[in-house]
C-alpha cells in the first residue's frame, strides 16, 4: 500500500442519509479529528438545520475519533432531542461512558 492509499483510508468522511421517517442517519467513516472536523460539520449541517427530533450516527466505519469528534456530536445533540450512536466501537463507547455523556449520546446496543 502506498502513502496515498493509506491516507485515503484514514481521512474522515460523513455521508448523510435519511431513514423511512425522514430522520437523518449520518455515516461516519475513517478518522474524525481536529484536522477534518470543520469539513465534516459543514457537510452534515444542512441536515441538522432542519431541526430533526433525532439523529443517528452510524459509526461502523469510524476508525478514530478525538475530542473534536465528541464536540461535534455534542453540538448536534444541542440542536436535537436525541442523538443515537449506532455500531460504536469499544473506544467510542469508553469515551462516551468515561465522560458521563451516556444520557446525551445514546449508544445503541
Give residue ranges: language-model regions.
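STAS-typified acidic loop motif
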Residues: 3-42
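Short, charged, intrinsically disordered terminal tails
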Residues: 5-10, 98-109
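Amphipathic alpha-helical interaction surfaces in cytosolic regulatory modules
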Residues: 31-105
Amino acid at each position: 500500500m502506498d502513502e496515498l492509499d493509506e491516507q485515503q483510508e484514514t481521512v474522515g468522511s460523513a455521508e448523510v442519509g435519511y431513514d423511512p421517517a425522514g430522520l437523518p442517519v449520518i455515516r461516519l467513516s475513517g478518522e474524525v479529528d481536529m484536522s477534518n472536523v470543520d469539513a465534516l460539520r459543514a457537510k452534515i449541517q444542512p441536515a441538522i438545520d432542519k431541526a430533526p427530533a433525532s439523529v443517528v450516527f452510524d459509526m461502523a466505519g469510524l476508525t478514530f475519533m478525538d475530542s473534536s469528534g465528541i464536540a461535534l456530536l455534542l453540538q448536534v445533540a444541542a440542536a436535537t432531542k436525541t442523538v443515537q450512536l449506532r455500531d460504536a466501537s469499544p473506544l467510542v463507547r469508553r469515551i462516551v461512558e468515561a465522560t458521563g455523556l451516556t444520557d446525551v449520546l445514546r449508544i445503541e446496543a
